[in-house]
Amino acid sequence: MKTGNRQQRGFTLLELLVVLTIVALMAGGGLHGWIQYQQAIRLEQSAQQLLDFLSRVQANSYWHNETRTVKLIPQGELWCMVAGQNEKQAEETCRENHPGQFVRRTQDVVLAKFTSNVFTFFGLRNAAQAGHISLSNSAGQLRLIISVRGRMRLCSESKVVLAIPLC
């Protein structure tokens, strides 16, 4: 029987271990990047939803030519924003699925800083009370700025988060 003519088929154990090590290292780095990206997406979406809510309140104020207030209600870990005709009409509790309220959707986005508990939008000339609200998580910190003329915009405070520019 001839045994010297055999061709090798398959991979050696050492080759398999090297390939598995390389794949594990690349997957670990990719997983870390993916988690950071998800955190940035959650922060950006929460800030955009808050901006949309405040824009609706501002548009409603301008449409009816009335002053509207938005009250910020921090309740421990939870927080929400409640819209009303004035500060006394705003509810004191956060409820899910209420059209006049903005409730945060993710647990990891926290309210970092704010200038006042009450933000006012004036129907006359579409003006507003100036202020800002900062939201943060492990991906960074975003600031929603409200100017006296009623302009609202988002900016990143310390580092660029996705496509939102620095303040």
Q: What are the language-model segments listed below?
A:
Residues K2-Q8, G29-Q48, D52-S55, A59, ...:
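N-terminal helix-rich module
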Residues R9, L14-V18, Q39:
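Internal alpha-helical transmembrane segments of multi-pass membrane proteins, especially GPCRs
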Residues L17-G33:
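Alpha-helical hydrophobic helix detector
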